[in-house]
Regions:
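ATP-dependent small-molecule kinase phosphotransfer cores
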Residues: 34-95, 124, 132, 136
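Hydrophobic anchor at the beta1->P-loop junction of P-loop NTPases
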Residues: 9
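Conserved lysine of the Walker
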Residues: 17
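Short glycine-rich anion-binding loops that position phosphate/pyrophosphate groups of nucleotides
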Residues: 82-85, 110-112, 159
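A glycine- and Lys/Arg-enriched "phosphate-lid" helix/loop adjacent to the NTP-binding pocket
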Residues: 99-144
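P-loop (Walker A) phosphate-binding loop of NTP-binding proteins
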Residues: 12
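NTP-dependent small-molecule kinase module
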Residues: 1-3, 27, 103, 133, ...
Length: 193
């Protein structure tokens, strides 16, 4: 049987994908993987430089290939770049992963809570200019896609990565037992089962 991530995290910039992946990996004693880091390793330069020097289409090609490989090879916690879900082939790959029993968690966050985390700096090339307005526009475009690919939705507003990790664990337990978490804060299960 091929490797498959224990969980895949998706969400906008500032939702905490990388830090939550680290927290979950630590709790579960698993490896963590971030597809943005994979893209940077292949390209030999930071994401921001790829956007400037090679353009967004090239970045998206590299990103999709990184997601495809990670879904096939990685058996730990996988964090996808914020825009990875926009690629139709990535959506198909995530659907196949879910159909095989995989769990995709949409880490939802409001602009109020994302802003301090993101810092709206040069390392976020899609947010340059008026970063708050651009972030809001990204979410308007991406929210339906995040929701469509997700098995579970967990809000990260006002809580740290350890609490988010606990809520993800509770949501995964809910999926196994079919019972809601005792604390009621595990997250929303979006599976159709």
């Amino acid at each position: 049987m091929s490797a498959r991530p224990r969980v895949v995290l998706v969400g906008p910039p500032g939702s905490g994908k990388s830090t939550v992946a680290h927290a979950l990996a630590g709790r579960w004693h698993l490896a963590e993987r971030d597809t943005d880091a994979d893209v940077e390793a292949v390209a030999g330069k930071p994401v921001a430089d790829i956007f400037v020097e090679d353009g967004e289409p090239r970045f998206r090609e590299l990103e999709h290939e990184a997601v495809r490989l990670a879904l096939a090879e990685h058996d730990g916690v996988l964090a996808l770049g914020g825009g990875a879900v926009l690629h139709p082939a990535t959506q198909e790959a995530l659907a196949a992963y879910r159909e095989s029993g995989g769990v995709v968690v949409f880490l939802d966050v409001s602009l109020t809570h994302a802003a301090p985390r993101v810092g709206f700096n040069q390392s976020r090339p899609l947010l340059l200019g008026n970063p708050r307005a651009k972030w809001q526009a990204l979410m308007t475009e991406r929210r339906p896609v995040y929701e469509a690919v997700a098995t579970v939705v967990v809000s990260t507003d006002g809580i740290g990565p350890a609490v988010v990790a606990e809520r993800i664990e509770a949501a995964l337990a809910d999926r196994r037992t079919g019972e809601p978490a005792a604390d009621g804060g595990a997250g929303e299960d979006r599976s159709e089962a």
